[in-house]
Amino acid sequence: MNKNPIYRSEEEAKNIACGNVAAELDENSQALDAINGAGWKQTIACTIAQGTLGCLVSYGLGNGGYCCTYTVECSKTCNK
């Protein structure tokens, strides 16, 4: 039996506990395509909304006009 789950045959996949990994990955990718199929206009709108919300939360937490990240470099400047 081949140890790489992608290269297993259908018959070998029936004998393992996790089943056919390639088929499960295909089902998952189809589900993600259905969820994300709203189009690029909605994606751009969501990106703008998330960026604006992030800036508002950062300002509400005491950041004086710059968006913070969790990096060490930014933390020093945001704490001023």
Swiss-Prot record:
The keyword Transmembrane does not apply. It is found in: Secreted. Keywords: Antibiotic, Antimicrobial, Bacteriocin, Lantibiotic, Lipid-binding, Secreted, Thioether bond. Residues 1-38 form a propeptide. GO terms for cellular component: extracellular region. The lanthionine formed by Ser-58 and Cys-68 forms a putative lipid II binding motif. Maturation of FlvA1 peptides involves the enzymatic conversion of Thr, and Ser into dehydrated AA and the formation of thioether bonds with cysteines. Modifications are processed by the flavecin synthetase FlvM1. This is followed by membrane translocation and cleavage of the modified precursor. The keyword Secreted applies. The modification 2,3-didehydrobutyrine is found at T43, T47. It comes from the Bacteria. Lanthionine-containing peptide antibiotic (lantibiotic) only active on Gram-positive bacteria in synergy with Flvbeta peptides, which are encoded by the same operon than Flvalpha.a. Shows antibacterial activity in synergy with Flvbeta.b, Flvbeta.c, Flvbeta.e and Flvbeta.g. Does not show antibacterial activity when tested with Flvbeta.a, Flvbeta.d, Flvbeta.f and Flvbeta.h. The bactericidal activity of lantibiotics is based on depolarization of energized bacterial cytoplasmic membranes, initiated by the formation of aqueous transmembrane pores. This is Lantibiotic Flvalpha.c.
